[in-house]
């Protein structure tokens, strides 16, 4: 599936809800499995439905715009309800309603209007705790900004522009080609004015007539709690500036989390290990252990077995988008068996072995302690 739901529907990120609905209906009728029997049409139909499911609802669309797929991964993508499209008959009505008139009646003699700026990508590294708790980060981004000298016109202050003589201000040129099948007209962007319809008399010295300049900007962005490797954040209108009055593009920040020496992460749960003595395992105890929230008390039950996993509830990773919900901290318990003991310890252990009816002559101390752990 396409990595971007907007691309799946073929719409701009600023598209209205009606634009999204129209694009969805157009593509859905094209790839509907009862209409399109080509291989892959059904899979394409499911992709289109999933994209519409996310983008048609303001809440899920907002989460997707900010976090990408991670923000909507919980939304149900299984199955498809044909009723979402207003009924199968409605699809056919839409299909055949477009064949009543001519094709290509719109005018092609129009200059290129405002153009949206390009989107930009920035990769940002976070340490383990920054990803869990979020916070503010300062970043520097090189991008194109509107030239402040000419206000984006590209013309030297005090001068202007004239109508392009090549396209007569249309921004496009038409070329007729004759073939054995008739004449065909090919329309392309004017090479002299690049579709603007106007030619600058004297270019701005600051930007060289481009209307934009490369600048490096400092930004403070908010990292939400619970982000993970690959989480994508959208910072609106911080991409490249548009041209001819177009809106700026967006900045997409992709997050990469540095590993931690003590903790690992699995979804919303945090994992760590502790090592205790065989006596602590047999008798039980209370210990202070490190968590992402600081030191916490952990109860080791008497008779704890090697590789037992103990849990501290609500000390894991906050849920992305709802930090009131947290995962757990899971602690794997390792038990240290001593390789050397003093005479007093040996005497006590031999007494214990006698009480338990265990022979300590075979298998050594470790074998004896192992039998204790698995009684």
UniProtKB/Swiss-Prot annotation:
Zn(2+) 1 binds at residues 147, 150, 204, 207. Its main location: cytoplasm. GO terms for biological process: chaperone cofactor-dependent protein refolding; DNA replication; protein refolding; response to heat. One of its GO terms (molecular function) is heat shock protein binding. It comes from the Bacteria. One of its GO terms (cellular component) is cytoplasm. It is found in: Cytoplasm. A zinc finger (CR-type) spans 134-216. Zn(2+) 2 binds at residues 164, 167, 190, 193. Binds 2 Zn(2+) ions per monomer. InterPro entries: DnaJ (IPR012724), DnaJ_C (IPR002939), DnaJ_domain (IPR001623), HSP40/DnaJ_pept-bd (IPR008971), HSP_DnaJ_Cys-rich_dom (IPR001305), HSP_DnaJ_Cys-rich_dom_sf (IPR036410), J_dom_sf (IPR036869). Coiled coil: none annotated. Residues 4-68 form the J domain. CXXCXGXG motif repeats lie at residues 147-154, 164-171, 190-197, 204-211. CDD domains: DnaJ, DnaJ_C, DnaJ_zf. SMART domains: DnaJ. Its cofactor is Zn(2+). Keywords: Chaperone, Cytoplasm, DNA replication, Metal-binding, Repeat, Stress response, Zinc, Zinc-finger. Homodimer. The J domain is necessary and sufficient to stimulate DnaK ATPase activity. Zinc center 1 plays an important role in the autonomous, DnaK-independent chaperone activity of DnaJ. Zinc center 2 is essential for interaction with DnaK and for DnaJ activity. Belongs to the DnaJ family. Participates actively in the response to hyperosmotic and heat shock by preventing the aggregation of stress-denatured proteins and by disaggregating proteins, also in an autonomous, DnaK-independent fashion. Unfolded proteins bind initially to DnaJ; upon interaction with the DnaJ-bound protein, DnaK hydrolyzes its bound ATP, resulting in the formation of a stable complex. GrpE releases ADP from DnaK; ATP binding to DnaK triggers the release of the substrate protein, thus completing the reaction cycle. This is Chaperone protein DnaJ. It comes from Rippkaea orientalis (strain PCC 8801 / RF-1) (Cyanothece sp. (strain PCC 8801)). The gene is dnaJ.
């Amino acid at each position: 599936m396409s990595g971007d739901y907007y691309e799946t529907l073929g719409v701009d990120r600023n598209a209205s809800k009606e634009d999204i609905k129209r694009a969805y209906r157009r593509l859905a009728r094209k790839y509907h499995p009862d209409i399109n029997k080509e291989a892959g049409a059904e899979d394409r139909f499911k992709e289109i439905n999933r994209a519409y499911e996310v983008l048609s609802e303001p809440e899920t669309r907002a989460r997707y715009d900010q976090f990408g797929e991670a923000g909507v991964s919980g939304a149900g993508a299984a199955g498809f309800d044909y009723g979402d499209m207003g009924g199968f008959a409605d699809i056919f009505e839409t299909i055949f309603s477009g064949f009543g008139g001519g094709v290509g009646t719109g005018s092609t003699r129009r200059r290129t209007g405002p153009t949206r700026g390009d989107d930009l990508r920035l990769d940002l590294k976070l340490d383990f705790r920054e990803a869990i708790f979020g916070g503010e980060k300062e970043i520097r981004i090189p991008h194109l900004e509107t030239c402040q000298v000419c206000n984006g016109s590209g013309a030297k202050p005090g001068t202007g522009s004239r109508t392009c003589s090549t396209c007569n201000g249309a921004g496009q040129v038409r070329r007729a080609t004759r073939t054995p099948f008739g004449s065909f007209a090919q329309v392309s962007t004017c090479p002299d004015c690049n579709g603007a319809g106007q030619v600058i008399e004297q270019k701005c010295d600051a930007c060289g007539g481009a209307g934009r300049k490369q600048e490096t900007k400092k930004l403070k962005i908010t990292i939400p709690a619970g982000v993970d490797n690959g989480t994508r954040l959208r910072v609106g209108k911080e991409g490249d500036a548009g041209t001819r009055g177009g809106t700026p593009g967006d900045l997409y920040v992709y997050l990469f989390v540095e590993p931690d020496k003590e903790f690992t992460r699995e979804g919303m749960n945090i994992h760590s290990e502790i090592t205790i003595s065989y006596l602590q395992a047999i008798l039980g105890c209370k210990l202070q252990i490190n968590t992402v929230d600081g030191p916490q008390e952990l109860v080791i039950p008497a008779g704890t077995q090697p590789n037992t996993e103990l849990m501290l509830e609500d000390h894991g990773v906050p849920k992305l988008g709802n930090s009131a919900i947290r995962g757990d901290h899971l602690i794997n318990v390792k038990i240290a068996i001593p390789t050397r003991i003093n005479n007093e310890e040996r005497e006590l252990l031999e007494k214990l072995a006698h009480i338990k009816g265990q022979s300590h002559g075979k298998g050594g101390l470790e074998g004896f302690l192992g039998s204790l752990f698995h009684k």
